[in-house]
Design a protein with these regions (language model features):
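A structural signal for multi-pass alpha-helical bundles of membrane permease subunits
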Residues: 4-289
Length: 289
C-alpha cells in the first residue's frame, strides 16, 4: 500500500507544474471571465457589483454585434472548407510525385516560418493600391484593405494562407500512412485515380480531416490578428470586425471588461456547440482503421 502511495505521489509531483499552469492560465481566467460577464467591472478590472444579464443585453443590443457575429461565422464558413480543399490537394500532389516531395514540403510549409505580424505587413504591401503586386498582376487599382467591400476578402486570403503549412503536413503524413498494398490493389482492379482519391484515400484519412476540420473552425472563430494589426481602429475596420477583434478593442482599448467577457463567452458557446455537433457527425462519416 505504501509503495502504491509513493508511486501516486511521484506521479502527482510530475503533474503538478502542468496542473498549476492550467489552473492559473486556463481555468481561473475562464471562471473569472464568466463572473465578469455578470458583473459591473471598472476600468481597473475590479468588480463593483452584480449586473445580472445587463452586460448580455447591452452587448447583443449593440449595432456592431450582428455584423461582428456575421463576419465571424462567414470567416469560419469559408476558411475551413477552403483550407481543407487546398491542403488535401497539395498533399495529394506531394504524395504522388515523390522525387519532388522535398521541394513541395519546403514550399507548402513556408507559411509556418512567418509570424502573423510579419505576414500581415507582407500582405498589406502586396495588396497596396499603389505598389502592390496583386493590383499590378491583375491590372486593378483597388485599395484592398482600405475598401469596405474587399477588406474582409483580403483578410480571409491571409488567414487561409497562414493555416496551410501545418495542415498540409498533417494531410501528407496521413496519406503516407495508408498501407501500400491497398493502393496497389486499387491499381490492379483498374480503379481510376480520381475514384481512388474519393473512394479510398479520403475515407482512409478521414480521422485527420476531421481533426483539421475541428481545429480550423476553432481557429477561425478566434480570428482577430489580421483585423487588429492591419485594420486597427480605422473607419474601415468595421468591415472586418469579428467577435474576437471586437473583444480585443473592448478589453484593451475601451477597458469595457464586461462587454469583452460577454463576447468571449459567446464565441466559446458557439465553438462548443459546433464541436458537439461535429462529434455527432463523426460517428457516421469518420472511419477509423
Amino acid at each position: 500500500m505504501k509503495m502504491k502511495t509513493r508511486k501516486n505521489l511521484k506521479v502527482l509531483l510530475f503533474l503538478l507544474p502542468i496542473l498549476l499552469f492550467a489552473v492559473v492560465f486556463v481555468y481561473y481566467p475562464f471562471v473569472r471571465n464568466i463572473v465578469n460577464s455578470f458583473s459591473l467591472v471598472n476600468a481597473k478590472g475590479e468588480i463593483r457589483g452584480f449586473a445580472g444579464l445587463e452586460n448580455y443585453r447591452y452587448t447583443y443590443g449593440r449595432k456592431d454585434f450582428p455584423q461582428a457575429l456575421k463576419h465571424t461565422l462567414l470567416i469560419a464558413a469559408i476558411n475551413v472548407p477552403a483550407t481543407l480543399i487546398i491542403t488535401i490537394s497539395l498533399a495529394l500532389l506531394a504524395n504522388k510525385r515523390r522525387r519532388l516531395s522535398p521541394l513541395y514540403e519546403t514550399l507548402f510549409t513556408m507559411p509556418m516560418s512567418v509570424s502573423m505580424s510579419a505576414a500581415c505587413m507582407i500582405f498589406k504591401s502586396m495588396f497596396s493600391p499603389s505598389v502592390g503586386i496583386i493590383n499590378y498582376v491583375f491590372g486593378l487599382n483597388l485599395g484592398w484593405f482600405e475598401s469596405k467591400e474587399t477588406a474582409l476578402a483580403a483578410c480571409l486570403i491571409l488567414t487561409i494562407w497562414m493555416g496551410i503549412g501545418f495542415d498540409f503536413l498533417l494531410m501528407l503524413s496521413a496519406l503516407r500512412g495508408i498501407p501500400s498494398h491497398i493502393i496497389e490493389a486499387t491499381r490492379v482492379d483498374g480503379i481510376s485515380p480520381l475514384r481512388r482519391i474519393f473512394r479510398v484515400q479520403i475515407p482512409l484519412i478521414s480521422p485527420t480531416i476531421f481533426y483539421v476540420f475541428c481545429t480550423n473552425f476553432v481557429l477561425a472563430m478566434m480570428t482577430s490578428a489580421p483585423m487588429i494589426i492591419i485594420m486597427g481602429v480605422s473607419a474601415e475596420s468595421s468591415a472586418t470586425n469579428t467577435l474576437m477583434s471586437m473583444m480585443y478593442q473592448s478589453g484593451f482599448s475601451s477597458s469595457d471588461y464586461g462587454l469583452a467577457a460577454v463576447l468571449s463567452i459567446t464565441a466559446f458557446v458557439l465553438t462548443l456547440g459546433f464541436t458537439i455537433l461535429s462529434f455527432v457527425f463523426e460517428r457516421k462519416r469518420v472511419h477509423y482503421q
